[in-house]
A protein has these predicted regions:
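Extreme N-terminal starter segment of soluble prokaryotic enzymes
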Residues: 1-3
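Terminal substrate-recognition subdomain of acyl/acetyltransferases
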Residues: 164-174
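Conserved beta-strand-loop-alpha-helix junction that forms the acyl-donor binding cleft
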Residues: 132-142, 159-165
Length: 174
């Protein structure tokens, strides 16, 4: 298994991964049409094309024998959400904005490899911490992030469709 930097030509692949993996991280009672609308707006091929062109973002793809297993996106910019800013104590901080692994690859160390690549990149860019938001009801992800050194430091709002969720803000000091 390898983790590589995503290229501009990976926008369609990243969209395909996101379309499969994002619904798995949503609350069980999230409406399918709200999930799809979020994917269409924030995880489309066009959205990934924009993300890949943004110098403040880095995207990574985990692969095994050239088959994609998951992806991560790191944002090297100060958070604009006041709840996140209030929760963070070590600045500057990069955001682990996206971390998703295909269901068949869960438990194989892929997410850990992606996190460590993101942490290494954030450290190289001078970040004092890495933060993320995770749904409070996503117990699997919360256990993983805790095991990976991300402490719960606050709560922020996350909108899917017309509904707001209260996500945990987690941070890892570098």
């Amino acid at each position: 298994m390898q983790v590589r930097s995503a290229a501009a030509s990976d926008a369609a692949l990243l969209h395909e991964l996101a379309a499969v993996t994002f619904p798995l991280a949503c609350p069980p009672d999230a409406l399918p049409e709200s999930i799809q609308a979020f994917i269409d707006e924030h995880l489309s091929e066009a959205a990934f094309t924009r993300y890949l062109a943004d110098p403040q973002r880095e995207l990574f793809i985990a692969e095994q024998d050239a088959a994609p297993l998951g992806y991560a996106m790191l944002v090297h910019a100060e958070p604009t959400d006041p709840d996140v800013l209030a929760a963070l104590t070590s600045l500057p901080s990069s955001e682990l904005s996206k971390l998703y692994v295909l269901p068949d690859a869960h438990g194989g160390g892929i997410a850990t490899s992606l996190v460590e690549r993101c942490v290494s990149s954030a450290r190289a860019r001078g970040a004092a911490s890495v933060w993320l938001g995770v749904n409070q009801l996503n117990s699997r992800a919360n256990r993983f992030y805790e095991k990976s050194g991300f402490e719960r430091v606050g709560i922020k709002r996350f909108k899917v469709g017309a509904r707001y969720e209260d996500d945990f803000v987690r941070a890892r000091i570098l």
